[in-house]
Regions:
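NAD(P)-dependent aldehyde/semialdehyde dehydrogenase
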Residues: 269-371
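ALDH superfamily catalytic-core signature
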Residues: 8-9, 46, 126-145, 160, ...
């Protein structure tokens, strides 16, 4: 083993320390956890100069695409936004101890289901420094210890942010092991986290398709994840044309690179000749390009032809796949074939059609007369989010504080024994 290789038990030791620290955190008061977050926000502001210098080193060494460089880059405004994000999480209701349900049995037993922390969370993410701050804040508030493994591109930035989070914990009298990062960027740490069954309770990956697919394939720990955000907007025959125009422009172009951006536009054949030419022109003048099926090209002939793979592609760019469909059921069949179970939207004034679409779409989030870009923890009122989940168990959609809890049953008796 080379001298600078990570020791095999680094993640194991961190997880054991996190387990002990997490027990203290889980039993702490709301006020104590809020104090930690407010103090961490102050520490982040105080370390702004150090953080920007560290971030400049990360950016200077970065060799990837411009869009990823922008996500990596910090400035004073983004540092302040991170600090305000910590304060916002502190202001949110505490999910720990919330009585989710309560009932009495005929024998006099009172049973209640109470929200509790998950335990130790492993967060694996790519090069966005703010993700580490958001994840740490949500885990602290929900009583979970967390191990943050960010991308190697942002390691210098992550260390300064981590120091600020630990300063906040220390100021509140909480164990600093509640928030930890590996000592270096060695990829072996990812494999160790994925194999840490019994030590880490939940893995949350946040990043590109290849990262998420690797985590889901190799993890021996439960995972909350989404591999792609292949979102659809369906313009129904009974859509308000101006509303549809506004929604489609926003859903595609507000921020094309986020997972809630619409990647495929489906237009009902009954309305396509009326709306499609003008809508394509509006999108094109804003820099959008297209991949269209044969029926869409019959209406707008100069559109580039779509391949089968195009409708299964998450573009993350100002590119839109366009198809014409024969009503709600045809739209649902297209989404079932190509979608990623993330977010779908219908634009219509027909309540029956909307209800059919809402009930027939097997995705984490389904919208009626709204942009798919509203799939966001902040927009849902969750405060910050730690990611989006498209699986079928524990949590679906934006993952906020409530989704970072599990529950226990408390049974209160007056001396009952079972016959």
């Amino acid at each position: 083993m080379r001298a600078d290789a990570p020791q095999p038990d680094v993640i194991c030791a961190m997880a054991i320390a996190a387990r002990g620290a997490g027990r203290v955190l889980a039993r702490s008061t709301t006020e104590t956890r809020n104090k930690a977050l407010m103090a961490a926000a102050d520490a982040l502001r105080a370390s702004q100069s150090e953080l920007l210098v560290a971030n400049a080193r990360d950016v200077a060494a970065f060799t990837g695409a411009a869009a990823f460089r922008d996500r990596l880059t910090l400035n004073p405004e983004r540092v302040e936004a991170m600090a305000k994000g910590l304060e916002q999480v502190a202001s949110l209701p505490d999910p720990v101890g919330h009585v989710m349900a309560e009932w009495d049995r005929p024998n006099g037993l009172r049973i209640r289901r109470v929200a509790t922390p998950v335990g130790v969370i492993g967060m694996i993410y790519e090069s966005r420094p703010n993700v580490g701050a958001d994840a740490a804040a949500l885990c602290i508030k929900s009583g979970n210890a967390v191990i943050l493994r960010g991308g190697s591109d942002s390691l210098s930035s992550a260390r300064v942010i981590h120091a600020a989070m630990q300063a906040g914990l220390k100021a509140a009298g909480l164990p600093v092991e509640c928030v930890q990062i590996p000592p270096d960027a060695d990829r072996a740490h990812v494999a160790s986290m994925l194999g840490a069954a019994g030590l880490i309770d939940l893995i949350i990956p946040r990043g590109g398709k290849s990262l998420v697919e690797r985590v889901c394939a190799e993890a021996r720990v439960p995972v909350l994840a989404h591999a792609e955000g292949l979102c659809h907007t369906y313009v129904h025959a009974a859509a308000d044309l101006e509303m549809a125009r506004r929604i489609v422009l926003n859903a595609k172009l507000r921020r094309p690179g986020i997972c809630g951006a619409t990647e495929t536009l489906l237009v009902d054949q009954a309305i396509a000749p009326k709306i499609l030419p003008g809508l394509i022109e509006d999108l094109a003048t804003r820099g959008c390009t297209f991949r269209a099926d044969a029926r869409a090209r019959d209406i707008v002939p100069d559109l580039p032809a779509a391949t089968e793979d195009d409708f299964a592609t998450e573009w993350l760019d100002a590119i839109l796949s366009v198809g014409v469909v024969d009503g709600v059921e045809d739209a649902l069949a297209h989404i079932a074939r190509y979608g990623s179970a993330h977010t779908e939207a219908i634009v219509t004034e027909d309540e029956v059609a909307a209800t059919t679409f809402l009930n027939g779409t097997d995705s984490a989030v389904v919208m009626w007369n709204a942009s798919t870009q509203f799939c966001d923890g902040g927009e849902f009122g969750f405060g910050a989010e730690i990611g989006i989940a498209t699986g079928r168990f524990h949590a679906r959609g934006p993952v906020g504080l409530e989704q970072l809890t599990t529950y226990r049953y408390e049974v209160i008796g007056t001396g009952q024994v079972r016959l």
